Amino acid sequence: MSAAATADTTSPHIPVLLPAILDAVAPVQGVWLDGTFGAGGYTRGLLEAGADRVIAVDRDPLAFEMAADWAGSYGTRLVQQPGVFSEMDTYAVALDGVVLDLGVSSMQLDLAERGFSFMRDGPLDMRMSQEGPSAADIVNEASAETLANILFQYGEERASRRIAKAILTERALAPITTTLHLAGIIERCLPRAKPGQSHPATRSFQALRIAVNDEYGELYQGLMAAERALKPGGQLAVVTFHSVEDRMVKRFLTARAGAGGNANRFAPEVQRDAPAFTLRSRKAIVADDAEVAANPRARSAKLRIAVRTQAPAGVIDAKSVGMPVVKVGN
């Protein structure tokens, strides 16, 4: 039986802030690229709103398996493109819009065998593309220092060193190969969660998932790829779910819109590229109370939108956008 056949379809992935995106970028027309196809919520929303064509990109083969029942109804208006959004400018250029949802799809969380969830017992995997080193490889092979850095830099876990030490102690007895095994180790290192608080393993699982899939590197490269792929007047909409992602997106768009200013007013004026984007708003768009009530996942979501100018695409270094970098290895 395929993974698509075993996925839980009773609790479908609800696209966060979709009405806000469609309202902000209206009228929806031309060719759009959905860089995080997932369960297809944004793609379908764009097509129903009037996009001539949507190029749907995802590195997870399961995404396209799950879409088999409905994708054909859109005919040639829906183009399924296996791959990563950091390479979007090799799939298409002169795009009218790009949308990125940086959250994990519920279809991935719902499948225990994918190893993303600390609430379901399964192999400690977390690979979106199902290729390359898994979370188990990192947990069982990385040094204590590397593990602590991953947990702190990628998950903002303040107990990172305590957890890393506990992982090394546990793996000396037996390999850590399942999600619940790892979650139990982390739980023993932290106070019990109070009502309304997130599970103690939330930050650590987030950090490992980011490391396994190089999510920050993908985001950094993807933002520059979007700048190259969008035509003048094309719109970029990015939905983030935690502070590091949002900081990276905000700094990128602010810098590429020429709105950063000099850090020191006494420093000499720095020669800047012509602005490649204009910001739709200085502040991020967040979900209203009604959406949060209907979809609790929307509580932490932030949407930022910018419009491409006619200026040539440029380059910005990773440090300037605040991208954390941890060398994953012993």
UniProtKB/Swiss-Prot annotation:
Its EC number is 2.1.1.199. GO terms for molecular function: rRNA (cytosine-N4-)-methyltransferase activity. It catalyses: cytidine(1402) in 16S rRNA + S-adenosyl-L-methionine = N(4)-methylcytidine(1402) in 16S rRNA + S-adenosyl-L-homocysteine + H(+). The keyword Cell wall biogenesis/degradation does not apply. Belongs to the methyltransferase superfamily. RsmH family. NCBIfam families: 16S rRNA (cytosine(1402)-N(4))-methyltransferase RsmH (TIGR00006). This is Ribosomal RNA small subunit methyltransferase H. It comes from Roseobacter denitrificans (strain ATCC 33942 / OCh 114).
